[in-house]
Amino acid sequence: MDQTLSGFGNVFVFLALGIVFVAGGYLTARMLRPSRPNPEKNSTYECGEEAVGSAWVKFNIRFYVVALIFIIFDVEVVFLYPWATVFKQLGEFALFEALVFAGILILGLAYAWVKGDLDWVRPTPNIPKMPELPAGKPDGSRG
């Protein structure tokens, strides 16, 4: 019986050792560091200047939508690049699979576009105002 690890076994051992190394460093640092919080340490630091306002700033949700779309297409490139390097060996069926993969992502982009998530300046909705009722008793009578 062969005692060596398979190709995936090497990857799993490397991954496990990486996780143990990072977790060990994190736990060691957490146990050795002093933890004495005070208001001065918890305050916002702005290069020696007095802090103006809060450090908590609300970001517009559109930034996150654009970042999410970028990440989706960035991951698409990560998946398609290895496919492109071995395209001749995989044949036409792999081309069809890659086109379906890209098509699904393009459909998602088209959906976001139609929904208006890619519009940076959105039009304000035109909400009709309700007509005002004449002043009188609550039951509507004027007498």
Swiss-Prot record:
- Where are the bilayer-spanning segments? 7-27, 63-83, 93-113
Q: Which Pfam families match?
A: Oxidored_q4
How does it sit in the bilayer? Answer: Multi-pass membrane protein
Q: Which reaction does it catalyse?
A: a quinone + NADH + 5 H(+)(in) = a quinol + NAD(+) + 4 H(+)(out)
Whether Membrane counts among this entry's keywords is yes
EC number(s) given by UniProt: 7.1.1.-
GO molecular function list: NADH dehydrogenase (ubiquinone) activity; NADH:ubiquinone reductase (non-electrogenic) activity; quinone binding
Q: Give the enzyme's main class according to its UniProt record, as a single word.
A: translocase
Provide the protein's localization: Cell inner membrane
Q: Which UniProt keywords apply?
A: Cell inner membrane, Cell membrane, Membrane, NAD, Quinone, Translocase, Transmembrane, Transmembrane helix, Transport
The Gene Ontology CC terms held by the record are: NADH dehydrogenase complex; plasma membrane
State the family it belongs to. Answer: Belongs to the complex I subunit 3 family.
Describe its function. NDH-1 shuttles electrons from NADH, via FMN and iron-sulfur (Fe-S) centers, to quinones in the respiratory chain. The immediate electron acceptor for the enzyme in this species is believed to be a menaquinone. Couples the redox reaction to proton translocation (for every two electrons transferred, four hydrogen ions are translocated across the cytoplasmic membrane), and thus conserves the redox energy in a proton gradient.
Subunit annotation:
NDH-1 is composed of 14 different subunits. Subunits NuoA, H, J, K, L, M, N constitute the membrane sector of the complex.
Protein's name in the database: NADH-quinone oxidoreductase subunit A
Native species: Chlorobium limicola (strain DSM 245 / NBRC 103803 / 6330)
Source gene? Answer: nuoA
